[in-house]
Amino acid sequence: MAVRRLNHAVLYIREVDRAVDFYTDTLQFVVAHHIPGRAAFLRASDTENDHDLGLFALGDEAAGPQPGNVGLYHLAWEVGTLGELAETGRRLQSRNALVGASDHLMSKSFYAKDPDGIEFEVMWRVPRADWPESGDMRPHPLDLDAAIAHWGADLATGAAAGSPT
């Protein structure tokens, strides 16, 4: 049997309460389980998972991520609409966490870093019928206003539209 999808991610972080505050504020995760000072398990609002993100605290002296080394580059969290992407971008900007924005033609994305410097992507999936034939994944500048003008702020795609993956 083949893998169907990623079920959850677990991150090592320095301090659990700071990370919980960040992820619940910016990405609107809810706390499913909390082990004070040690770990937390967060759930996306519309998931059927017990948790989608685990956070394990290592302490303030732990080294941060090292860009350019072998390992995980980033996780991509999917939102359902361009309106949700815009709102998430505003929350990330208000926390000075936003580090980039890209149009991958098949998705519209913001890139950010959490308080421990762990990079992640928040993306909206372009409707499959509008994907380019070439599969070009090179990043292009994101024009979110133009995307909203084209598809509207409330068009649900991906998991929000019932896609199993």
Residue ranges of predicted features:
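Short, charged/polar surface micro-motifs in flexible loops or helix N-caps
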Residues: 47-50, 60, 80-85
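Acetyl-CoA-dependent GNAT
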Residues: 57-60, 125
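Short active-site oxyanion
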Residues: 7-8
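Core segments of cupin and vicinal oxygen chelate
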Residues: 11-57
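Short glycine/proline-enriched turns and hinge-like loops at secondary-structure junctions
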Residues: 35, 66-68
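Short beta-strand/turn micro-motifs at beta-sheet edges
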Residues: 60-66
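Vicinal oxygen chelate
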Residues: 4, 13-18, 69-70, 75-119, ...
